[in-house]
């Protein structure tokens, strides 16, 4: 809200006016014309009289202001801007070379040069500069009237808040806001043109600047009435979407474009849009999404408010019908809530079942399960009432309340919203006013006044359902920058209602929304990005399509009757009287007035009178944005009912009225029919709920997806950088924008532009240009014309005391950098190397001066900061003023007493205490500091820095002082730049490795070594190389990227098959712990975090008496007096420290589409990723940097056809992170700050740390087994159509593989078995589990497979050696699946195994998992790799006939190759990827033979071998650096058909001669062209055969017999499960039967028919159809494997049949 009005009239300001006029520099308020029309009608206010004197005979209405501004023409080339071009080129060169991406230079160069020299762009730029100069001269000025000012051919006269613009004989009287709107439009167009030149240079279709210029010209020439003009502007974007869908939809039709009138109103624009559609649909969507460059309409207040008040009352349905439909919605809400609750907590919420409730619900509740049948039978839930699930949090955190919201103090104050002169003019009476306002008009002031000291008392009336009369008034405020001519309105309420709002919405957000799956309200922006990328991709694959719903005035449609039933249920869930129900009926008793200062309603005895335009007494809804969360829940409820009614599979994702529905295709109906039925049902149910769905404006598409202003075309985000960059403003909501805040705002806008784009380059290059333009407007010519000074200025960022700049914004590539200093030094190093800038100039600009004393407080708040003296920033000064102002105020409130404390001094004292840490670890200091009350106090002061708050908060701060303060800051920056003295010499720090330099620079400024802060700059630590010509040395430590196909420019905008990489999911290392019974307050959370950190330090072996003292003081100051130090589950460990964040989904700084074409992995960083130590590597940055390299090669015209790698280049950048111990050297002086937290915190005493005598490794393993089991059960129920990201239920992803390797997995697996036996699965759950494991799907199974990539773990895990002979497995995944299923395959053995776990561990709680893992880190040992054998040959061997791969086709080939290798006595063998992987695997098992695979940079073949191997042979015998570097062989090789040193096999035709060892030899072996004689080779004895080469079940007759019996009983169990496809299991069993028949000498049939089924509740598997109920299954292609022959020789007695079940014997014996 602006204060034009409030600061200008004496009658309305609380102190003598310091006449500051026009207090804004960019448009922040709605455009209203009422003051102008009042001025034209009456001449009662003195400045209105002055304004009327300036008007010409032809005066445009203020709403047509844009017609006049369109005619402004400037003389060409007024401003010299050559220096900007050269500086921009220099800056971009330096940035690009610092990142080692030099191939981008040319492309960026030409784009910047073209952008700043093209005459049209330049003219627009000069216009923008001219506007900004005027704005700078007239805003915040003491003179009321300024003028005339020239703007090209226009003259401007500023008279207080009014402006008269004149061209020739036409004038236009408008408000200052109208002028700002025109200035903003000029700025927006200037930015748009520059951004589009850069974008055009960087994408394959080439430049599209002409189209943009053409579009500007067409729009400026539209000569239509005001409303039609803005109708066109508003419909450009949706019309373009309609055009794209009309052309590119595949399975559904769309005539959305026909809704808009553009073709009739403006045919030129229509043809331009269609031309763009021809060129490229993405270009059309990108250009048309720019809506803020075409002026803003003035809001038509009378029509707008009349329509708004009408909508708040109109009734579509009768109240009775709404109430009954409300009850229907309540049933589905209960069903959805309980379903979500069960899947999250594995139990039902507390419920009360009414009489007549269905029996299936009772059963499900007792079992704590959810039956899928309830989805169809949701009506049953009308008999279920959910009881109390949580309490209302009655003491919301200050941070939630202290946003800068306007409130109206009480109902009596309504008259202060209007101008008295306007009332007199309209009604001819005086406006009666109280002598003063009854209270503050901003929330913050109410806080300072102590109105919020007792929130529960404020809310008490809502519990009773009786709201004070004084609170029942709402002001509807028009919203700014809206393209709707009739405007949108937001509510401004009284304090009590505002707080009620906060508490009710927070309760829903925290306790109800997380269980509902149909909205994105509780998702972080990163989680949402991941989700939308996934969704938009599924739509384009043809499996589903999307319906985008458009409700007409959604917010105004919710009637009290519809909400009453659900509100009653919410009151029961929170046990809070009438709290939620009060909210539904509140609008019926509230008076609404429209905020329009010059058009007041009539006042009758002090009350506003209803007139339907400016005032309404009692309506049916509260207006926009009030109960958003409740309404979102209701909307999704009726959508679910509608879609279930027509029986489709669907997902809903919605937030407010932005609802999208994804419908999956069905086998019986085509998509078009589904879409029409769905829309019909949705319309019907919306109507029942009293809403109107505009069906013709709902669109259906399978190529576009739009959600929350993000737009996707064919699964790829449409770059939003044009839209973002055209809206870059320098306004941050600051009271007075200063240089620092303007630049900071600009850099963060560039950041968000990059986030909306598929490449960071556009945002970076445009950002640099806009930054230079901003400096051009702000700084004097002396600085601007000095090119090297300007360049250096832009490359010195805040980390060494400079201004914020896009150049040091690595966040264009990554969001945030863990340590900005090395990057900053690398930039300056490159600057000196590549341009002619000298080091002394750098010293002059940086002026590094070490602060006179160490400022520990700044180190604690930002651990990466340097201790240097900087120019004092305005906000710090303003902050001091605020503190003083509040402290001197006379109020006695919690906040005032809080401010009277010496906050900053106490914070400095604590920081000084922490600085005695030896060694000095700033990250630990920061974590400790954050737990104190002082840190909390400082965070609250920061909230008070927002603009208007400050001014109104203290009568002492004048706007003028603030304005002067900003001027002072700018002047001191300018003085500093013009002053030629140099600061500290930076030369030594700009040479060599920046990681070391940064450490030294920190040491220099702080006087001590800082540990654990510096992180290397990624482009120095790793260098990109192509795999062509890469030597083996590069592969020693490398990250390898393999393109899916040859990548060219069109790959930058299409999706590949790899997952989209937006940064690793840096998983939470510790789950948020709950200390049960802790109240939900900020204090309690801080107590919890303190206890967690303390516990964490104990586990980390940091035991220091001073630290204990400090921790005790932290607890005491929060009112926690107990001595119990409970062991807690929780706290996240980031950078080796617990912090409060949840899982931080890492984010690259842009949408990294190219990553979907690249496979990459860090498995080949041998020294770092394989070790369990931690090193200074930020993997997320490294991975992103690799993708960025490919992106830049392609953008600069190259192609990527071969794999490439990032190899570790700077050895000093890798530093091992050592142990974390520290001590505090001195007794802490900090005594605590008790004044802050009002409620004492208690923790239930019964929690004690009983689990000390346990072995942490066993405890951790035991818990992990249970968590894996629970996650499996949740996975079974998850549907494949669920849109949320597939993560394990217990968040297992948070554990790193190196942590997992240190646990004894035999215990983990036994614990999992114990859990599965105890879980007593229902039939459908068992079937689900078996189906899921056989298909190898589900996040939990993927987690297990990731852990078991390490064969050593797999072999160590479970008593595999004892059990493997009983398991018939085919591959590693199959083995893991059967291992998990063992309790169902052979319950007897499993029970014996499980009983081995010591029963004392049953008391261990899996909630403490993280602490056990942390403790196990130091004691656990990694299992050693061991290599098992294959059968080997020697010249004089002893025949035993045991051959590897005995089941496979290539077994003989493999034996011959092994003989050749031994005959030739080879030490090194090259193998090409064309060789059968099984043979290669066998060769890897030969001892004393080094294998080199000819990979040529692509590790896929090696990974295949690793996956097949079940011991450590492949990983230990393949020389991986040489394999990756090898493109051809240099020695003996297997694979090619010819060439020197090639061993090849020739299959013999008919004559197979005997061989002493192999019965018949199928191959002759040749080396080059010579025959190798292998006739004398014979077997070596075999001790430990590898399970991958010799199936354990065929190893002896005994093991085969056991496996056969196990498998038989398992198949019989499976037959009992309804709805499970038995075929694959039967085929597996049949493999064993064939071998059994061969052993018994039975004839083996090629094809067999089985009859399967359940007869009299018993399973039947027979070869004869003796009952009609049996199902027939045919198994063909049967042949015994070669191992069978060996077993047959072994079984001469026929002992196989002894003791077999009769049914099994019948299957074996063929009659």
Swiss-Prot record:
GO molecular function annotation: ATP binding; mRNA 5'-cap (guanine-N7-)-methyltransferase activity; RNA-directed RNA polymerase activity
Membrane-spanning segments: none
EC numbers for this chain: 2.7.7.48
Location in or out of the cell: Virion; Host nucleus
Entry GO CC: host cell nucleus; virion component
Reactions catalysed according to its record: RNA(n) + a ribonucleoside 5'-triphosphate = RNA(n+1) + diphosphate
ATP-binding keyword on record: yes
Domain of life: Viruses
Stored Pfam families: Mononeg_mRNAcap, Mononeg_RNA_pol
Record keywords: ATP-binding, Host nucleus, mRNA capping, mRNA processing, Multifunctional enzyme, Nucleotide-binding, Nucleotidyltransferase, RNA-directed RNA polymerase, S-adenosyl-L-methionine, Transferase, Viral RNA replication, Virion
Domain RdRp catalytic: 543-715
Keyword Nucleotide-binding recorded: yes
Motif segment (Nuclear localization signal): 844-852
Described function: Displays RNA-directed RNA polymerase activity. The mRNA guanylyl transferase and mRNA (guanine-N(7)-)-methyltransferase activities are supposedly provided by cellular enzymes. The template is composed of the viral RNA tightly encapsidated by the nucleoprotein (N). Functions either as transcriptase or as replicase. The transcriptase synthesizes subsequently three subgenomic RNAs, assuring their capping and polyadenylation by a stuttering mechanism. In replicase mode, the polymerase replicates the whole viral genome without recognizing the transcriptional signals.
UniProt subunit comment: Interacts with the P protein.
Protein name: RNA-directed RNA polymerase L
Protein source organism: Borna disease virus (strain V) (BDV)
Organism lineage: Viruses, Riboviria, Orthornavirae, Negarnaviricota, Haploviricotina
Protein encoded by which gene: L
């Amino acid at each position: 809200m602006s204060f034009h009005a409030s600061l200008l009239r004496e009658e309305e300001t609380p102190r003598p006016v310091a006449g500051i006029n026009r207090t804004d520099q960019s448009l922040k308020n709605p455009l209203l014309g009422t003051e102008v029309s009042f001025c034209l009608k009456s001449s009662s206010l003195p400045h209105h009289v002055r304004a009327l004197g300036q008007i010409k005979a032809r005066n445009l209405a203020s709403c047509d202001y844009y017609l006049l501004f369109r005619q402004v023409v400037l003389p060409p080339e007024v401003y010299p801007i050559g220096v900007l071009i050269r500086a921009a080129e220099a800056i971009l060169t330096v940035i690009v070379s610092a990142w080692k991406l030099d191939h981008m230079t040319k492309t960026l160069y030409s784009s910047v040069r073209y952008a700043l020299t093209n005459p049209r762009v330049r003219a627009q730029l000069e216009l923008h500069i001219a506007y900004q100069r005027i704005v700078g001269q007239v805003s915040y000025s003491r003179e009321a009237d300024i003028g005339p000012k020239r703007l090209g051919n226009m003259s401007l006269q500023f008279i207080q808040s009014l402006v008269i613009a004149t061209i020739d004989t036409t004038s236009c009287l408008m408000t200052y806001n109208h002028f700002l709107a025109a200035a903003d439009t000029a700025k927006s167009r200037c930015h748009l043109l520059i951004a589009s030149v850069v974008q055009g240079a960087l994408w394959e279709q080439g430049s599209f600047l002409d189209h943009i210029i053409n579009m500007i010209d067409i729009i400026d020439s539209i000569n239509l009435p005001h409303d039609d003009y803005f109708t066109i502007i508003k419909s450009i974007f949706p019309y373009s979407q309609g055009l794209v869908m009309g052309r590119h939809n595949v399975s559904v039709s769309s005539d959305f474009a026909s809704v808009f009138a553009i073709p009739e109103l403006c045919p030129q624009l229509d043809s331009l849009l269609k031309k763009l559609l021809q060129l490229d649909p993405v270009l059309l969507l990108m250009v048309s999404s720019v809506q803020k460059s075409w002026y803003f309409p003035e809001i038509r207040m009378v029509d707008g408010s009349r329509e708004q008040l009408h909508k708040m009352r109109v009734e579509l349905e009768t109240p009775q019908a709404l109430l009954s439909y409300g009850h229907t919605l309540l049933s589905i809400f209960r069903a959805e809530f309980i379903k979500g609750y069960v899947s999250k907590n594995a139990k039902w919420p507390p419920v009360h079942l009414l009489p007549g409730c269905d029996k299936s619900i009772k059963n499900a509740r007792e079992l704590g399960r959810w039956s899928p049948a309830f989805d169809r039978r949701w009506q049953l839930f009308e008999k279920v009432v959910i009881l109390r699930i949580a309490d209302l949090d009655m003491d919301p955190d200050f941070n939630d309340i202290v946003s800068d919201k306007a409130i109206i103090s009480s109902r009596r104050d309504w008259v202060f919203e209007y101008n008295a002169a306007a009332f007199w003019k309209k009604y001819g009476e005086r406006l009666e006013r109280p002598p003063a306002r009854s209270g503050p008009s901003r929330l913050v002031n109410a806080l300072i006044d102590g109105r919020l000291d007792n929130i529960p008392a404020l809310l008490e009336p809502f519990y009773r359902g009786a709201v004070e009369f004084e609170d029942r008034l709402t002001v509807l405020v028009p919203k700014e920058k809206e393209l709707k001519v009739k405007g949108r309105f937001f509510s401004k309420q009284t304090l009590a209602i505002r707080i009620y709002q906060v508490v009710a919405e927070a309760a829903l957000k925290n306790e109800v929304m997380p269980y509902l799956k149909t909205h994105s309200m509780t998702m972080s922006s990163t989680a949402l990005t991941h989700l939308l990328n996934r969704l938009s991709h599924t739509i384009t694959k043809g499996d589903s399509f999307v319906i985008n719903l458009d409700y007409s005035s959604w917010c105004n449609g919710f009637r009290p009757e519809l909400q009453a039933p659900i509100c009653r249920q919410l009151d029961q869930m929170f046990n809070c009287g009438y709290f939620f129900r009060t909210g539904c009926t509140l609008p019926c008793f509230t008076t609404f007035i429209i905020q329009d200062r010059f058009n007041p309603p009539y006042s009758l005895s002090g009350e506003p009178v209803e007139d339907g335009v400016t005032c309404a007494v009692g309506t049916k809804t509260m207006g926009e944005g009030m109960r958003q969360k409740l309404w979102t829940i209701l909307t999704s409820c009726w959508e679910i009912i509608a879609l279930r009614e027509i029986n489709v599979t669907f997902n809903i994702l919605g937030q407010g009225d932005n609802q999208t529905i994804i419908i999956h295709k069905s086998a019986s109906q085509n998509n078009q029919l589904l879409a029409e039925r769905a829309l019909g049902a949705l319309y019907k149910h919306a109507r029942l709920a009293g809403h109107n769905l505009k069906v013709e404006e709902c669109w259906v598409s399978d190529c576009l997806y739009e959600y929350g202003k993000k737009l996707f075309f064919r699964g790829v985000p449409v770059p939003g950088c044009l839209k973002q960059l055209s809206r870059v403003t320098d306004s941050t909501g600051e009271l007075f924008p200063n240089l620092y805040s303007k630049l900071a705002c600009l850099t963060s806008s560039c950041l968000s532009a990059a986030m909306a784009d598929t490449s960071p380059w556009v945002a970076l290059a445009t950002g640099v240009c806009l930054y230079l333009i901003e400096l051009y407007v702000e700084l004097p010519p002396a600085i601007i014309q000095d090119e090297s000074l300007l360049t250096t200025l832009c490359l010195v960022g805040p980390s060494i005391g400079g201004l914020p700049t896009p150049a040091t914004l690595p966040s264009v590539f990554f969001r945030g950098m863990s340590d900005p200093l090395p990057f900053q030094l690398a930039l300056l190093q490159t600057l000196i190397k590549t341009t002619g800038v000298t080091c002394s100039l750098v010293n002059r600009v940086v002026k590094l001066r070490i602060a006179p004393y160490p400022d520990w407080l700044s180190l604690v708040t930002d651990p990466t900061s340097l201790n240097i003296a900087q120019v004092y920033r305005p906000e710090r000064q303003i902050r001091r003023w605020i503190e003083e102002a509040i402290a001197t105020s006379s109020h006695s409130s919690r906040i005032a007493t809080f401010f009277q404390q010496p906050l900053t001094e106490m914070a400095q004292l604590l920081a000084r205490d922490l600085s005695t840490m030896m060694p000095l670890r700033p990250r630990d200091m920061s974590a400790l500091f954050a737990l104190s009350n002082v840190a909390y106090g400082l965070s609250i002061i920061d909230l008070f820095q927002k603009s208007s708050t400050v001014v109104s908060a203290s009568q002492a701060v004048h706007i003028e002082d603030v304005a002067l303060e900003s001027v002072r800051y700018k002047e001191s920056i300018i003085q500093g730049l013009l002053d030629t003295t140099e600061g500290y010499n930076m030369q030594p720090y700009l040479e060599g490795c920046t990681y070391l330099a940064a450490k030294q620079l920190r040491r220099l400024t702080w006087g001590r070594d800082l540990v654990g802060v510096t992180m290397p700059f990624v482009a120095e630590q790793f260098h990109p190389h192509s795999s062509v010509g890469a030597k083996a040395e590069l592969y020693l430590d490398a990250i390898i990227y393999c393109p899916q196909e040859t990548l060219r420019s069109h790959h930058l905008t299409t999706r590949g098959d790899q997952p989209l990489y937006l940064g690793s999911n840096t998983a939470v290392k510790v789950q948020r712990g709950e200390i049960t019974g802790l109240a939900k307050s900020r204090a309690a959370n801080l107590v919890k975090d303190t206890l967690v950190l303390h516990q964490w330090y104990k586990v980390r072996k940091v035991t220091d008496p001073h630290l204990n003292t400090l921790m005790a003081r932290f607890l005491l100051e929060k009112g926690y007096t107990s001595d119990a130090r409970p062991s807690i589950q929780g706290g996240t460990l980031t950078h080796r420290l617990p912090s409060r964040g949840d899982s931080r989904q890492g984010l690259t700084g842009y949408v990294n589409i190219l990553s979907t074409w690249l496979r990459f992995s860090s498995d080949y960083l041998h020294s770092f990723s394989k070790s369990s130590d931690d090193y200074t590597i930020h993997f997320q940055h490294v991975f992103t940097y690799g993708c960025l390299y490919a992106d830049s090669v392609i953008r600069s015209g190259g192609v990527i056809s071969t794999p490439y790698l990032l190899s570790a280049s700077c050895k000093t950048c890798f530093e091992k992170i050592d142990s974390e111990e520290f001590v505090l050297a001195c007794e802490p002086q900090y005594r605590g700050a008790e004044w802050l937290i009002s409620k004492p915190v208690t923790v239930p005493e019964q929690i004690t740390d009983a689990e000390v005598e346990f072995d942490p490794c066993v405890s951790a393993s035991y818990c992990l087994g249970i968590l894996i089991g629970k996650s499996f059960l949740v996975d079974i129920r998850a549907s494949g159509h669920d849109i949320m990201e597939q993560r394990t239920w217990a968040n297992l992803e948070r554990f790193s593989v190196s942590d997992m390797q240190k646990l004894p997995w035999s215990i983990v697996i036994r614990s999992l078995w114990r859990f599965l036996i105890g879980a007593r699965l229902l039939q459908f759950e068992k079937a689900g589990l078996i189906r899921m494991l056989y298909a190898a799907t589900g996040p939990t199974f993927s987690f297990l497979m990731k852990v078991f990539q390490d064969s050593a773990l797999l072999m160590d895990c479970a008593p595999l050696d004892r059990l493997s002979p009983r398991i018939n497995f085919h591959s590693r995944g199959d083995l893991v699946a059967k291992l998990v299923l063992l309790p169902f395959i052979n319950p007897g053995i499993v029970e014996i195994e499980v009983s081995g776990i010591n029963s004392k561990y049953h008391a261990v709680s899996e909630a403490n998992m993280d602490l056990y893992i942390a403790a196990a880190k130091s004691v656990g040992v990694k299992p050693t790799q061991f290599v098992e054998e294959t059968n080997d040959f020697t010249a004089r061997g002893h025949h035993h006939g045991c051959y590897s791969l005995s089941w496979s086709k290539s077994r003989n080939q493999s034996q011959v190759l092994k003989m050749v290798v031994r005959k030739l006595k080879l030490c090194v063998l090259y193998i090409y990827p064309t060789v059968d992987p099984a043979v290669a695997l066998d060769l890897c098992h030969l001892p004393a033979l080094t294998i080199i695979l000819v990979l040529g940079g692509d590790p896929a073949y090696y990974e295949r071998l690793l996956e097949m191997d079940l011991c450590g042979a492949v990983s230990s015998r393949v020389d991986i650096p040489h394999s990756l570097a090898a493109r051809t062989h240099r020695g003996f090789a297997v694979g090619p058909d010819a060439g020197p040193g090639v061993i090849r096999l020739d299959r013999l035709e008919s004559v197979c001669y005997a061989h002493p060892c192999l019965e018949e030899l199928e191959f002759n072996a040749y080396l080059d062209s010579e025959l190798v004689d292998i006739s004398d080779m014979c077997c070596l004895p075999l001790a430990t055969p590898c399970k991958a080469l010799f199936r354990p079940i065929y190893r002896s007759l005994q093991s085969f017999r056991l496996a056969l019996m196990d498998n038989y009983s398992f198949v019989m169990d499976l037959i009992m499960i309804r709805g499970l496809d038995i075929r694959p299991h039967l085929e597996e069993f049949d493999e064993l039967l064939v071998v059994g028949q061969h052993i018994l000498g039975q004839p083996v049939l090629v094809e067999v028919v089985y009859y399967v089924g359940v007869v009299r509740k018993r399973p039947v598997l027979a070869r004869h159809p003796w009952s009609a109920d049996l199902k027939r299954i045919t198994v063909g292609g049967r042949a015994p494997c070669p191992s069978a022959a060996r077993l047959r020789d072994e079984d001469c007695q026929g002992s196989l049949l002894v003791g077999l079940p009769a049914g099994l014997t019948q299957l074996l014996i063929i009659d």
